[in-house]
Amino acid sequence: DVYTRQTLDKALDVYAKIAKEVNASVADIIVLAGNVAIEKASGVEVPFLAGRGDATEEQTDAESFRVLEPLADGFRNYQKTEYSVSPEEMLVDKSQLLGLTAHEMTVLVGGMRSLGITKDNLGNFSEENNKLDNDFFKKLLDMNVAWRPSGNNAYEGIDKVSGEVIRTASRVDLVFGSNSQLRSLAEVYASDDANDKFVNDFI
């Protein structure tokens, strides 16, 4: 559910072809592709260290991986279904499993949103998604916008002057404005002179 099978198969076919041409592992090519995408979006060099290996089909128990499928991934605004635990709590739980600090979690979510990596376009506040910048935080903390629920884990941002819906977000997105600790981090990145810091922290 996190990725559509069609999209995933298409991408993996391309990665496998490149890996064969340059005698590298598919795992290395996937990481390198991510690095190149971030470099193009930020204009900053991203370090790369090769050496990952690929497991063969014989070495992999495909059935055992089903229990590893994510129930929720707040970094991508994905949630498989409704749970008794809130989406933002599940984001914090995943962050702790990854060993991320609140600061690292904040900058990672902001970067993913600025690049348009989100389900159902929630939290995608940027007009162009090919640039890594602090636009998510600037627009999230815009005092001219009022938020109202529009569905399960979905909110509409209403322009206080025109009354028009100008953006949409999830509970995960809005927690960076409502939680005091996360808001303090978001305010740092939302500053006009904080874009370079944001990009460097993300990388």
Predicted regions mapped to residue ranges:
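Long, well-ordered alpha/beta core segments of mature domains
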Residues: 1-203
